């Protein structure tokens, strides 16, 4: 590991710059020291194609061997090797690999990484169960009126031929993922040398955070500048349920906006002493985004405001998914593939309003308010704040 590191006065004293990169975070590398003196290397892994979220940040620390957390997008393995070389570390030296969740910008180069390093592969127990399936195809789309309408709108509005190349890359990623084997399934409270694991589902069912002293590697659970996309509620297709690994999973506790907000509460409860190290936007717009748990509180507030807006729109007579989505998002965020992301985000919020008893959803998918003095979603969020 390099001895001569440049200290820049604008950064906290426990953070040293190893490599100065671009304003958008590309090519940066840092050494971050925890409260106990443990060093964590943070390196930006550039994607092959442009990404709105920027590079994926991979973290490396030494405790009974070198551990790596998250890798990057498919086809970016050469970029990863180059980024690691800036720290003086070779992929071959890595003893343990942890993936914070099974999205392609985090586990996209796992097959190549394992082949070259021989590292022990660790991930949440639901990652093992679901890695053989496309995350968009496991849902029973007839499970609720909202899911039925979401599926219909997707077929009507999205031309798969336009995104043919993207779908082919997507399929290749899942096929490659099937070839990997997880050596250790992690659960809430699992420990590995130097770190503790927290299960924080909601953005993804297998999302975990990794605590190293006062440093929390959050994956996509908590991000600066952008709010992670929550999952909608899940009911597995019947054929998926019959998989021995999947049938042990609880869809109720791994998916949905309510689950995500509860997981944010878990991070908030860690207290003001910790610092969050995200998988995206650690460095962006020429500045370091080193956040505390207040960022998790900000994201909870974001969703509370979105629930408030939807509740108000329904009260004013907007009663279907299309109208509510166009009321919530500007037109530029409803173009192309962004449309499904916006629709599914609205579905996640409507499901929570339905679950807590604030709205009724007919079999046709129309929505009406239940007449209450105080909406129940307010109590739901306040209770999480109190517990935190």
Where are these regions (language model features)?
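Residue-level signal for the nucleotide or nucleotide-sugar donor/cofactor binding architecture
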Residues: 108, 255, 341
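Divalent metal-coordination and catalytic microenvironments
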Residues: 61, 70, 80, 101, ...
């Amino acid at each position: 590991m390099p001895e001569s590191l440049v200290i820049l006065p604008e950064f906290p004293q426990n953070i040293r710059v190893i490599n100065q990169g671009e304003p958008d975070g590309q090519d940066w590398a840092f050494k971050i020291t925890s409260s106990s003196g443990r060093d964590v290397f943070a390196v930006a892994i550039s994607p092959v194609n442009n990404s709105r979220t920027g590079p994926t940040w991979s973290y490396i620390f030494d405790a009974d061997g070198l551990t790596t957390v998250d890798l990057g997008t498919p086809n970016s393995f050469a970029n990863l090797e180059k980024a690691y070389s800036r720290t003086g570390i070779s992929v071959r030296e890595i003893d343990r690999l942890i993936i914070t969740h099974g999205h392609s910008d985090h586990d996209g180069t796992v097959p190549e990484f394992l082949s070259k390093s021989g590292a022990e592969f660790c991930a949440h127990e639901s990652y093992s169960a679901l890695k053989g399936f496309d995350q968009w195809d496991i849902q029973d789309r007839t499970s609720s009126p909202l899911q039925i309408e979401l599926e219909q709108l997707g077929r009507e509005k999205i031309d798969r031929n336009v995104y043919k190349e993207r779908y082919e890359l997507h399929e290749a990623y899942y096929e490659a993922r099937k070839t990997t084997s997880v050596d250790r399934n992690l659960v809430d409270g699992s420990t590995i040398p130097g770190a503790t694991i927290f299960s924080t589902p909601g953005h993804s069912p297998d999302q975990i955070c990794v605590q190293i002293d006062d440093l929390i590697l959050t994956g996509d659970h908590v991000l600066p500048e952008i709010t992670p996309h929550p999952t909608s509620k899940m009911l597995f297709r019947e054929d998926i349920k019959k998989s021995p690994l999947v049938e042990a999973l609880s869809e109720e506790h791994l998916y949905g906006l309510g689950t995500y907000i509860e997981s944010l509460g878990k991070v908030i409860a860690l207290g003001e002493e910790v610092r969050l190290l995200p998988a995206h936007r650690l460095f962006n717009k020429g500045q370091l985004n080193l956040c505390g748990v207040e960022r998790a509180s900000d994201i909870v507030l974001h969703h509370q405001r979105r629930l408030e807006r939807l509740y108000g729109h329904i009260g004013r007579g907007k009663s279907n998914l299309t109208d509510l989505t166009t009321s919530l998002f500007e037109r530029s965020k409803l173009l192309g593939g962004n449309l499904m992301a916006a629709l599914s985000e609205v579905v996640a919020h409507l499901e929570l309003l339905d679950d807590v008893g604030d709205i009724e959803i007919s079999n046709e998918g129309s929505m009406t308010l239940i007449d209450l003095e105080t909406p129940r979603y307010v109590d739901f969020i306040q209770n999480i704040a109190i517990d935190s």
